[in-house]
Amino acid sequence: GALYWQLNDNWPVASWSGIDYYGNWKQLHYHAKRFFAPVIAVCVPDKEKHLEVSVSSDVPRPLSGSLVLRIMDFSGTILKRFEFPVNLKAQEAATVRKLDIAELAEKPDEVFAYLELKLTDGTTEYTHYNDFFFTEYKHCNLREAGIRHVLERKEELWHLTLESDFPAFFVFAELK
């Protein structure tokens, strides 16, 4: 099991909560929605410089499908692509593959892994997306991102669209 500390704030304050006092989701809550999903795919490096690609299911039925792993640069170019079959028993976790990190990422600060898991029990389809960075975010060799915004009013709602020509980690928009 897991404990989610702390879900929300009971007054306006800077805190570790996933939801602020006004009910707005913070970055943590978006991540929590992903890591508490019924099926997940993750990459975990080991001490021998391998990358364990694993999947986990909380679904009480057997699942089958595939896991696609893409090694991409920060401009979105796919450098390598792998597809692995996945067959899980009910509520099972399993390592799908163990890969050599040196063969995946010659320049760890210029690439990342993107995972796309699609499983079904014959009735329901489950999808999960995840990523793995071979180095800390602060060491990623990113180009300067130009972020453009469009703010439109449609009937009673405002719509904010952000676009970037290159990755821009952890962009936050605040409307007042």
Where are the regions a protein language model picked out?
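Carbohydrate-binding surfaces of carbohydrate-active enzymes
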Residues: G1-K176
